[in-house]
Amino acid sequence: ILGNVYLHHVLDVWFEREVKPRLKGHAHLVRYADDFVIGFELEHDARRVMEALHKRMAKHGLRLHAEKTRLFPFNKPPPGQSGGKGPGTFDFLGFTLYWRRTRWGNWAQNFRTRTARLRRSKQAIDDYCRSHRHESVKAQHAALRRRVHGHINYFGVNGNVRNARRLVRAAERSWHKWLRRRSNRAR
């Protein structure tokens, strides 16, 4: 928690008081614990802040992760292009952010569960079913329900229903598979 308070002064307050007033376009900072994304309207502003950010972090004994720190365009795609995974897609806090078309043909930012995170959740549920298959069905159901609901409570954002359903179906298949293996009799 002390790191969060420290980063609040090093990054959040600095960005609002020092950086934003000097920018030509709009900018927005989103931070959770030690992960953050800064969105800029103008590329020139982004490059200037990137330089200043490295200096600011070094001044306070911090450094940015080289592989995670990058500049890339995340503009609305041109009218003729379809959305989906592209150079402007990025991962943040377990989500993949991308552009998609709405029902009315407009562009909107969308979130979906990061592929690796969804795979890890499915594997964790399968491991649980395998290692707890000796427990009563009622106890297994309660535990699986907690796990699936926990995942959906975090990743259940608008536009991510398909991945939530995938996890539920994977949990059902895994549970059924391991229940059938409890004895020689098929259930």
Language-model segment annotations:
Residues 1-187:
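Non-catalytic terminal/accessory segments
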